[in-house]
Amino acid sequence: MGARASVLSGGELDRWEKIRLRPGGKKKYRLKHIVWASRELERFAVNPGLLESSEGCRQILGQLQPSLKTGSEELTSLYNTVATLYCVHQRIEIKDTKEALEKIEEEQTKSMKKAQQAAADTGNSSQVSQNYPIVQNLQGQMVHQAISPRTLNAWVKVIEEKAFSPEVIPMFSALSEGATPQDLNTMLNTVGGHQAAMQMLKETINEEAAEWDRLHPVHAGPIAPGQMREPRGSDIAGTTSTLQEQIGWMTNNPPIPVGEIYKRWIILGLNKIVRMYSPVSILDIRQGPKEPFRDYVDRFYKTLRAEQATQEVKNWMTETLLVQNANPDCKTILKALGPAATLEEMMTACQGVGGPGHKARVLAEAMSQVTNPATIMMQRGNFRNQRKNVKCFNCGKEGHIARNCRAPRKKGCWKCGKEGHQMKECTERQANFLREDLAFLQGKAREFPSEQTRANSPTRRELQVWGRDSNSLSEAGAEAGADRQGIVSFNFPQITLWQRPLVTIKIGGQLKEALLDTGADDTVLEDMDLPGRWKPKMIGGIGGFIKVRQYDQIPIDICGHKAVGTVLVGPTPVNIIGRNLLTQIGCTLNFPISPIETVPVKLKPGMDGPKVKQWPLTEEKIKALVEICTEMEKEGKISKIGPENPYNTPVFAIKKKDSTKWRKLVDFRELNRRTQDFWEVQLGIPHPAGLKKKKSVTVLDVGDAYFSVPLDKDFRKYTAFTIPSINNETPGIRYQYNVLPQGWKGSPAIFQSSMTKILEPFRKQNPDIIIYQYMDDLYVGSDLEIGQHRTKIEELRQHLLKWGFTTPDKKHQKEPPFLWMGYELHPDKWTVQPIVLPEKDSWTVNDIQKLVGKLNWASQIYAGIKVKQLCKLLRGTKALTEVIPLTKEAELELAENREILKEPVHGVYYDPSKDLIVEIQKQGQGQWTYQIFQEPFKNLKTGKYARTRGAHTNDVKQLTEAVQKIANESIVIWGKIPKFKLPIQKETWETWWTEYWQATWIPEWEFVNTPPLVKLWYQLEKEPIVGAETFYVDGAANRETKLGKAGYVTSRGRQKVVSLTDTTNQKTELQAIHLALQDSGLEVNIVTDSQYALGIIQAQPDKSESELVSQIIEQLIKKEKVYLAWVPAHKGIGGNEQVDKLVSAGIRKVLFLDGIDKAQEDHEKYHSNWRAMASDFNLPPIVAKEIVASCDKCQLKGEAMHGQVDCSPGIWQLDCTHLEGKIILVAVHVASGYIEAEVIPAETGQETAYFLLKLAGRWPVTTIHTDNGSNFTSTTVKAACWWAGIKQEFGIPYNPQSQGVVESMNKELKKIIGQVRDQAEHLKTAVQMAVFIHNFKRKGGIGGYSAGERIIDIIATDIQTKELQKQITKIQNFRVYYRDNRDPIWKGPAKLLWKGEGAVVIQDNSDIKVVPRRKVKIIRDYGKQMAGDDCVASRQDED
């Protein structure tokens, strides 16, 4: 109603709805056309409010008209709609769109003449753009109006939706009308994320700017006062000019339209980008034999817009190539239209032409339009008195037949012209099935929908017989009849074609069964006596010629419709009703449009369909599959296919549960892997606790859900499967799906989406009815009385049936309790369907899995269910049939669960007016239970939480995780967060939260005293404990022997080391902490270099799956105070260094020695460099270098070869390689294997230098290593290296190994190009695709990274290492003065070893101490001798 009220008044709307879309057409304008137009205008960033007035419509027409020549069909439709609306506003009388366009043209011609006259009168030739962004204010000054956010938003949307397709150019042109260079740059900056495209655009702009400077040299001498300087290329591009200068140039007299010039440059660049994104030539656009003309035209114009040519050339292409490249069917029609035909005339004439359905539709058209059968079905008896000249088959002359011809016999068949047989043996039937003149006896052919909009319904292919006297109504038939006759609507009996269309006919007082055959000219019946005279005749059939008797003017009754015509009687195997009688009763062959719109589906990019061989099947399975598939084929769910389809998916059969019937299964795993991903439209199943209480409820089930939705035509071929034969007796029977297959990944999403669209109108009409839809289950609830409710249910069922969805009565639940989604629903309560836990003596893995599933399902309403001990039984990889003995804990848990399930429990429904409350209880052993309710003791639902996110945790952390899980669950079910009642005191929570606030959040909560309460069992100190002993702990283990040591060194000189077996580095670190806790007093400081150990203990766990961590927790609980600190390993920190030496003795020393053999073996295979071996085998650099030096293949003249590859982060190797006669310049980052490559026009220094500067602009390049090619040794490249600060090194002449990295990468790159070459039209595209694949899609080498990940890691590590080195160097330049305990005298200076967050590690003489930060003064060492302790004051620089 908004559109009616705002755009057109009542009277205007009436006039609007009388205007026809096409001259002589039936369709008229409706309100929906205005709504569509306003939406389209919003896409173009044009105010839809302009449609409300004639002046607004005129402005819109002015904007749209320049883009009409290159615009899409939608743009033309929008222009036509606005033009018609303009005429309605202006009260111009028009009958159709064509008249509206003529009126607009007349007005524009008149206004143009007036404008020319006015211009001549005033002599003012300069026109200022009336469009944004330069407007004239009241004082006559030119003012810049900034480009609007709405326009920018429209531009961003264009790029996002169209992705640099040809439509982008006219849209950019329209959006940037009258813009300044600054505005154009703003537009480009908003889409700057498309870096590759923007780089191409920048290059084009730079080229055009240089060309402008060349053609417009700067005039010598100063600029005259009051005169503006002339713009340079960079000024036009907006980089060196101000906004005021741009406005000045654009409004000057004479103006310099810098905005338009810059816009032209950008469009040139956009053309190049479009060509890259759409690399198809207009010459390659040809119409396929089955392609609808509309689709061909769309492709043609899309590609035409991407062509870089003048408008004149594009017009020539449209006039010649459009017709020339059409398929033969369309070309014949287009040539008949003549050279001056408009595109609209071409589209109308070729509508429905093309493809195998074309001929059948032409015949159907003829049969539906013809009223006098005698004019078409030419029986010889009808033209007895007309003389027909005979014509000779042999010589082609009239007056004699071939038998009497005197000319030499012509070679080959007289009928088809082929050699090898004579006419009597010719197999080409001439049934005259398609006579081109039939379809057009009554003028222009009826317009058929294009192929793409017709989806043949699998259940609606049928033969329709219609006439004026039938009473049975069919909705689809009535519409089709109205289309044919224009005035009278007809009623159609429908005969399905999934079986032979056999009907009962009445002829000569006898009832007979006959076949309706639209492929036969004549009606032929088996031997019978008919009244009247007959004459002999010979007719040709499939089995040869037969002799028949021809009876004329015989009345016959077919399906209640009477006809009179010629009947042939003879020895026919089946009675046939031919077209001579079918046309009289108005019988047509119909392929009705499927009501459900197919969802287009594609394979993943670069993938082809599945080609998995069918495995052998037993005889009974083959028989079952043949039977099932025959039935499915009759129903239209699948279709037979030929050998042209190369795809296959395996099929097999299993017996249904408790039945002798078989079920067909197709293994779509491979197709699923190759099919595009789908967004699951429903992320979970609805829950009954979220249902509102309703007076009346019904549960429906949709029958054959997936098989009611058609599958995308273009995708069907990929669903092909084969039923084999026994012993390969015959070729397998091949089928493909026409509907959504069971087991295919797209079926659920497409079905849900289709179902939602179908239910949407019903939901809108009945807002008070709630429909919960999950797959094929429907829950319908309302507050209507039961009678009214059931009426609405019938309406819903009929609505679904109209769309092809049946709701079987046997699954239609009218009375409670309703079984829905595994739940049992009652009017005022719900529960899960009855759960029976099996009694077993022995339990297999599969049995326990099923048991846990049942208990989890029950836990949503039965409070207190536990499964932790049962789940423990399933740990590890076990076979499904393996028998598992139940532990005592698991048996106890199962017994408790059985007791809980004995008493039935119900949940209530949700009341939106009341708050949600959650209460959580701790069950012990890391298990929690909770209840969600609105009133006490009336639970909406219950649940449990037992997930442990780590091996070591505590109750507060678990409680937090449980709260977050419940909060998420509540948001999903009810859309709001409940209030929580938690068994934890506020003080305990606050203590935890102050340390871990950033990692946890919980909503509003209150304390409830439900034992057992949650508490923290111990706390770690934040500062070192004064007076307590400090333990430096460390551990080490050998990876091969699993032997290890753990120990500690204390500040009081104590030390201890224990040897361990079957251990790891992490375990030894924890063992060392355990030793320190065991051997220390009630207060202790512990210093470790293990981040792993620190992370575990700082989280304050009170339970752990690790026995060792559990022992540490026990020790921590016993202590009064514990301070735990971390220092970095191997940094020379006293206590840490001492304990490291202590535990490493005999352990760490042999670690790298164990790796030497492996490294030597690896080097013999791959000749890896020393850096790779040092990294892969944990070798010291000196050992790795020794392995390389002792390798005879890595030697040159008795010493390590100088060409040994340097893997420093800034080194790149460059080389040129050749492919397909073109030059590819390749740069390889030596350390990572990362590649940059580009096709260059010539192997010159200029191109190489340009490439090198681009490389240096992207990555840190310190050194390049090249061969001695002329382009690399050129002065241009040397100059570029000098400017960018790059060192250039050259390889050893005639030694390819000196360029080994880039040479091997050349080979690798060519190999990848070969793999992707057929996917790209141009080599330069294939090169960039190959570079992308190599850099980001191939992993391996050091770290198992891709080359792209590796280069980033190497550069980041290099920066970090340098920064760390700086810090270490810096830290050694500081001296520390400190105070001990309560002694007020400052001591020092001491050496600073490490500065932590809360404390520092210092070395004073030989003592290493940990001192709190608040008790130290850190000052820089300036190299001067201090006078004494008392001269240290706060005057010094402090840190």
Curated annotation (Swiss-Prot):
Name of the gene: gag-pol
Q: Where is this region: Interaction with host CALM1?
A: 8-43
The protein here is known as Gag-Pol polyprotein
The protein's Enzyme Commission number: 3.4.23.16, 2.7.7.49, 2.7.7.7, 3.1.26.13
Annotated region (Interaction with membrane phosphatidylinositol 4,5-bisphosphate), positions in chain: 73-77
Q: Where is this site: Cleavage?
A: 132-133, 363-364, 377-378, 432-433, 440-441, 492-493, 591-592, 1031-1032, 1151-1152
- Additional remarks: HIV-1 lineages are divided in three main groups, M (for Major), O (for Outlier), and N (for New, or Non-M, Non-O). The vast majority of strains found worldwide belong to the group M. Group O seems to be endemic to and largely confined to Cameroon and neighboring countries in West Central Africa, where these viruses represent a small minority of HIV-1 strains. The group N is represented by a limited number of isolates from Cameroonian persons. The group M is further subdivided in 9 clades or subtypes (A to D, F to H, J and K).
Q: Report CCHC-type zinc finger ranges.
A: 390-407, 411-428
Kindly list the positions annotated as binding Zn(2+). H1163, H1167, C1191, C1194
Which Pfam family, just one, is annotated for this protein?
RVT_connect
Residues annotated as site: Cis/trans isomerization of proline peptide bond: G221, P222
- The protein's organism comes out as Human immunodeficiency virus type 1 group M subtype B (isolate JRCSF)
